[in-house]
């Protein structure tokens, strides 16, 4: 976004952050340095999703035990700096221990995560480790004040603990978990991999291989924890050079040990290869993958997604109807549409209920037990919905409800930030497009059929173009195509053709057993 700065003081960091507009979105990637492809993936995602990217490098002594590798932990500051510049990082924060812990560590205020999150997995053999992790991460989050912070799924226990601490302390940041990045041979990338000799590296592959064995059993319908763990242990017995620390199956959010996978489980493993301790994990998910359909107004998202959901046996979630409903509520109650606190406070008390019994008809919507299915599609609501949807507090409330609905999987959701913000982990992301002229023509014909002739085609085209601009420029969760979305242009295509294409893509990616 601007000049690259490598900063070593909190004063310098906060001064640099203060130069950005309040509307700027800040993405933060905390690291301990010795950056590799996994870190690069986090930075690239932050760069894609945020206006400003901040990376920190700090080898935190608070999270190392007395016999651990604090002194020999890899340090490569100049190479790390060059990589950050190459990836478009704006601010690289490289503080000293004295800068972050000026009073020393013996009398430091620390963050103690809930015991149930630390008594299993790595916490069992590394007492105090996650106290150190939580303390430094929350300290950095307070200093940087990011909108989004990015962490790798490889450190799954750390990710769960940070999410819990952020939620419990009401921190204003979204924690983003990103997939594990692996070398071509399957070994999960880690700064500690450079400790391994060629022979040790070959042995270390047993970790990811044992997870692959368990995943194969899971895909065949094995959901029992004891059987899955037996698959892992049986494979590892072939490698006596690898000393197993643990292999456990837990819930990925609560970290509670599971006896059987009912929805989703985290199969986590740690082991010693020589003097190097390595970790790895995989998610075993029984939930049906989410279909996320994004696109501009008038691209046909609602109709297409409803019909695709019916064909695939998924629940249809019309997020646009949710925003329309709360917009209607604001108008009905004569709220000042420029008074964001009043709007958010009012919407926080609203109860929304959606039903889509007929895929050929718009979603039926109730707000506070009052059906508003027709009212939310009025021209007045259409003209105001982007203004309300752009409010950060409103989007947060709606996204919370949308994620709660999608927590058990098996939904088809459409909107403008489904694949990028609401369900970034969606199994299939579709970006549905059409030219502004095509979308205006469709909307004009729809209004004609409904008996509304108040606007001309030219006026509708101007409205659609203005809404596109507003959605793309809103500061919170702006409208854009997800990097892994498949684009489908609906110009000159019939509804059935578009639905058929999406259904084929979903079934090809997720064949039913």
Curated annotation (Swiss-Prot):
Q: In which pathway does it act?
A: Cofactor biosynthesis; (R)-pantothenate biosynthesis; (R)-pantothenate from (R)-pantoate and beta-alanine: step 1/1
* CDD domains named in the record: CMPK, PanC
Q: Which domain of life is it from?
A: Bacteria
Q: Please name the GO terms that the record assigns under molecular function.
A: ATP binding; CMP kinase activity; dCMP kinase activity; pantoate-beta-alanine ligase activity
Q: Where is the active site?
A: 39
**Which reaction equations make up its catalytic activity?**
(R)-pantoate + beta-alanine + ATP = (R)-pantothenate + AMP + diphosphate + H(+); CMP + ATP = CDP + ADP; dCMP + ATP = dCDP + ADP
A Gene Ontology biological process in which this protein takes part is: pyrimidine nucleotide metabolic process
Q: What is its main location?
A: cytoplasm
Give a yes or no for keyword Cytoplasm in this entry: yes
Naming one, the record's GO cellular component terms include: cytosol
Q: Which residues bind (R)-pantoate?
A: 63, 158
Keyword line: ATP-binding, Cytoplasm, Kinase, Ligase, Multifunctional enzyme, Nucleotide-binding, Pantothenate biosynthesis, Transferase
Where in the cell is the protein located? Cytoplasm
Region Cytidylate kinase, as annotated, extends over 283-513
Instruction: Detail which positions bind beta-alanine.
Output: 63
The Enzyme Commission number assigned here is 6.3.2.1, 2.7.4.25
Positions annotated to bind ATP: 32-39, 152-155, 181, 189-192
Coiled-coil region(s)? none
Q: Which PANTHER family match?
A: CYTIDYLATE KINASE (PTHR21299:SF2), CYTIDYLATE KINASE/PANTOATE-BETA-ALANINE LIGASE (PTHR21299)
Functionally, this protein is described as follows:
Catalyzes the condensation of pantoate with beta-alanine in an ATP-dependent reaction via a pantoyl-adenylate intermediate. Catalyzes the transfer of a phosphate group from ATP to either CMP or dCMP to form CDP or dCDP and ADP, respectively.
Similarity annotation: In the N-terminal section; belongs to the pantothenate synthetase family. In the C-terminal section; belongs to the cytidylate kinase family. Type 1 subfamily.
Q: Which HAMAP family does the entry link to? A: Cytidyl_kinase_type1, PanC, PanCY
> What name does this protein carry?
Bifunctional pantoate ligase/cytidylate kinase
Species of origin: Thermosynechococcus vestitus (strain NIES-2133 / IAM M-273 / BP-1)
């Amino acid at each position: 976004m601007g000049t690259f700065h490598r900063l070593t003081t909190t004063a310098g960091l906060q001064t640099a952050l203060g130069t950005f507009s309040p509307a700027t979105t800040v993405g933060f990637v905390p690291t301990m340095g010795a950056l590799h492809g996994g870190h690069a993936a986090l930075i690239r995602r932050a760069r894609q999703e945020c206006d400003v990217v901040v990376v920190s490098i700090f080898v935190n002594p608070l999270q190392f035990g007395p016999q651990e590798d604090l002194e020999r932990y890899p340090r490569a500051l100049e190479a790390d700096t060059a990589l950050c510049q190459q990836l478009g990082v704006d601010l690289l924060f490289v503080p000293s221990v004295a800068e972050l812990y000026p009073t020393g560590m013996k009398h430091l205020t620390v963050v103690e995560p809930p015991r149930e999150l630390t008594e299993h997995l790595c916490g069992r053999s590394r007492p105090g480790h996650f106290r150190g992790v939580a303390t430094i991460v929350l300290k950095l989050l307070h200093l940087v004040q990011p909108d989004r912070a990015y962490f790798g799924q490889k450190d799954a226990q750390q990710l769960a603990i940070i999410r819990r601490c952020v939620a419990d302390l009401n921190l204003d940041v979204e924690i983003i978990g990103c997939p594990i990045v692996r070398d071509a041979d399957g070994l999960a990338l880690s700064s500690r991999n450079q400790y391994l000799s060629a022979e040790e590296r070959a042995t270390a592959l047993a970790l990811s291989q044992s997870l692959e064995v368990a995943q194969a059993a899971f895909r065949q319908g094995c959901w029992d924890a004891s059987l899955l763990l037996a698959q892992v242990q049986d494979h590892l017995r072939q490698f006596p050079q690898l000393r197993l620390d643990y292999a456990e199956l837990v819930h990925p959010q609560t970290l509670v040990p599971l006896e059987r996978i009912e929805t989703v489980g985290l199969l986590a493993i740690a082991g010693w290869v020589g003097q190097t301790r390595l970790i790895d994990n995989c998610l075993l998910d029984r939930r049906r993958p989410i279909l996320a359909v994004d696109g501009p107004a008038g691209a046909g998202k609602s109709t297409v997604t409803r019909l695709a959901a019916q064909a695939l046996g998924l629940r249809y979630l019309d997020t646009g109807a949710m925003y329309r409903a709360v917009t209607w509520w604001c108008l009905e109650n004569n709220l000042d549409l420029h008074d964001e606190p009043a709007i958010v406070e009012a919407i926080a008390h609203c109860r929304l209920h959606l039903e889509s019994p007929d895929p050929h008809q718009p979603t039926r919507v109730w707000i506070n037990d009052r059906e508003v299915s027709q009212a939310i599609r009025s021209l007045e609501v259409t003209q105001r919905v982007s203004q309300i949807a752009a409010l950060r507090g409103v989007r947060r409330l709606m996204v919370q409800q949308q994620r709660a609905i999608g927590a058990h999987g098996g939904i088809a959701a459409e909107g403008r930030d489904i694949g990028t913000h609401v369900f970034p982990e969606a199994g299939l992301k579709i970006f549905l497009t059409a030219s502004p002229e095509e979308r205006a023509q469709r909307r004009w014909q729809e209004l004609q059929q409904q008996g509304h002739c108040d606007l001309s085609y030219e006026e509708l085209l101007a409205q659609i173009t203005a809404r596109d601009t507003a959605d793309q420029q809103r500061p919170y969760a702006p409208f854009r195509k997800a990097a892994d979305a498949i684009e489908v242009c609906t110009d000159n295509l019939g509804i059935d053709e578009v639905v058929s294409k999406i259904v084929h893509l979903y079934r090809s990616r997720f064949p039913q057993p």
